[in-house]
C-alpha cells in the first residue's frame, strides 16, 4: 500500500509555463497536450477566428482578445508520468494571478522568443521563481524565423536573468536555413521538416561531431555546427541536476512550437529531471508529500467557469496525503469540518469528477462563497500554508452603476470577482461608492466585461485620484483614533480589512510619518 502511495507521488510533475506575451506559450501548451494525448488536434491559436479556440483560453474575453487572462489547469499522462500543467496569464497586467499560480507548482518552463530574447514580463516572473528557488527549464522558440544568434540568446538569459544556461540541444541554422537540432548529450541529429507529422523529420544518431555522416547530412552547414559546439564547450556550463533543482541553472532547448519541433525532446528531459512534489512551508513546520495525513491550500478561485452552472471553483493544490472522494477535512480558517463530495480535475474547460488524487495534483472544489484564496484544508492538524500574497493595487477606478435597481447584483459581482483575486474592491468608511483597485490596467476591462456578461450589470468607471493603497493594522486604541482622524481616506476591502488609500506618494509618506504606531502593509497574506 505504502509503495503504491509513494509511486503515485513520484510520478507527479506539476509545473507552469512562463513567458512574455506572444512568445508562444499557448502554442507550446497545446503541443504538450498533444503528446500527452489530451487533445487530438492543436487548436492553432492564430486560427482562433475560426470556430475552435485554443484549448486553454476558455473565457469569453480571452477568446476575443487571444490572450490567456486566467490560469487554467490541465492534466495529462505521458510515459507513466502524471503531469499537471498550470497555464498562466500571458498578459502584463495579470502578474498577481500568475504569482499565485507559481506558488502551486514544483517547477517552471520558461519560453523565450528567439527573435526578441528576454522580455520584461519574463524577467518579472523569474524573480518570483527565484524567491521560491523554483527549478526552471528553458525552451527557445521560433527557430523557424530569423532571430538572434543562439550564443547571443544564452548570453542574454545569463546576464539579464542571472541564471546559468546549460544547452541540451543546439540548432543547425535558423529561419529559412533551419535544418534541425543536435542533442549535445545523446549525439542525435533531429531534422526539421515542417511538412512531416509533428514537424519532425528523421532522427539520426551520430558518433559525435567528427562523424563523416554529418558532412553528408548537413553539407556546408556542418562547419557552423562544429564551430558553435566547440565554442560552447569552452563557454557554456555542462548540465548539473543539483544546480537545476536549486534554481541556479536552466537546461536550454531550441525548437519551433508552432511546428511541434523540439517539444518532445523537451518533454522527455522534463519528466526525467524535473522534481516530483516538494515539501511545503506552513506557519508552524515543513510538510512532506509522503505524510499520510491529507493537506493542501487554495491558490485561486474562479467564478463562472461554466455559464450553464453559475459556479465557483476553488483550485486546490494537494501537498500531502491522499484525497478520496467524500472525505471529511478541516477547513482551518473557519475551524470546521467539511465533506468534499464532488471535487473535479481539469482539462481546460472539461471537468471530470475525481475519486482519488495525490500530492502535486490540482483539484477543483465547488465553492459557495466559503472558500478563499490561501485557505488550508487538513485532516485535523492546525496548519496554515504560507506565501500566497495579495499585492497593494496601483490603479483605481470608481464604479458608477447605470441602473440603480441593480445595486445588489453589482455588490455580488464585485465581491465575487475580488474573491478570485483578479481585482480588489474597497468600500469607503464614509459613503457608499465602490472603488476597484488593480495591479494592472487590463483588469478593469475584465471586471466590466464580466459584470455585464455574467452578472447582467451595466456600469461605467469614473476616475479617482488615488495612486496607492496600504493595509493598516495597530493596537485598538490607536486604530480608533486613526479611523476618526483619517476617515475620509479609509476603506474596507472585500474581506473587511481596513486599507488607507493615498492620492500621492507624498501623502502616504506624510501619513506614515504622522502615525508611527500604525503599521502600513504593501502586501497582505490571504487571511
UniProtKB/Swiss-Prot annotation:
Which GO BP terms apply? regulation of translational termination
Q: Which UniProt keywords apply?
A: Cytoplasm, GTP-binding, Nucleotide-binding, Protein biosynthesis
A GO molecular function term, named singly, is: translation release factor activity, codon specific
> CDD domains, from UniProt?
RF3 (cd04169), RF3_II (cd03689), RF3_III (cd16259)
Residue ranges annotated as coiled coil are none
Task: Identify the GO cellular component terms for this protein.
Answer: cytosol
Subcellular location as annotated? Cytoplasm
Cell wall biogenesis/degradation among the record's keywords? Answer: no
The entry's GTP-binding residues are 19-26, 87-91, 141-144
tr-type G domain sequence ranges: 10-278
Function, in words: Increases the formation of ribosomal termination complexes and stimulates activities of RF-1 and RF-2. It binds guanine nucleotides and has strong preference for UGA stop codons. It may interact directly with the ribosome. The stimulation of RF-1 and RF-2 is significantly reduced by GTP and GDP, but not by GMP.
Q: Which family does it belong to?
A: Belongs to the TRAFAC class translation factor GTPase superfamily. Classic translation factor GTPase family. PrfC subfamily.
Q: What is the name of the protein in this document?
A: Peptide chain release factor 3
Species this protein is from: Geotalea daltonii (strain DSM 22248 / JCM 15807 / FRC-32) (Geobacter daltonii)
The organism's taxonomy opens as: Bacteria, Pseudomonadati, Thermodesulfobacteriota, Desulfuromonadia, Geobacterales
